[in-house]
Amino acid sequence: MGTTRHNNRAIVATKAGEMGRVVALMDDLFFQMKLAETAKQLGVEVKVATNGEAFLGLMASEPKLVIVDLNARSQPIAAIEKLRETRKDVRVVAFLSHVQTELAAQAKAAGCNEVLPRSSFTQNLAAILSAAKD
């Protein structure tokens, strides 16, 4: 059975059995809950950090996928750059408003594999998370 634990640094959704591991950097509560619920349904373990320091700390869990909200208030581009200094192999998917083309270019330059408009990210969230199970 699934459980969700909350504290001031991370939200962790877990489910018994074999799981993919996902780490996310986002401070938007709506997206945190959507991510946790979708992950729970798919049997994917998700750890969500609300700041760059907690995000980098969660990387010790060896995630298969990293998700970044480029509109997070905690310098997400810097967090991606820092991540890429040590982890070049992990897939990084970021999302933002479709009009933020300059921010999208910065994210790609920082090391994002994919940068999606928020609407596309939401629409394809189940498929994005399912890829972490492979």
Q: Predicted segment positions?
A:
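Conserved phosphotransfer cores of two-component systems
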Residues: 84-89
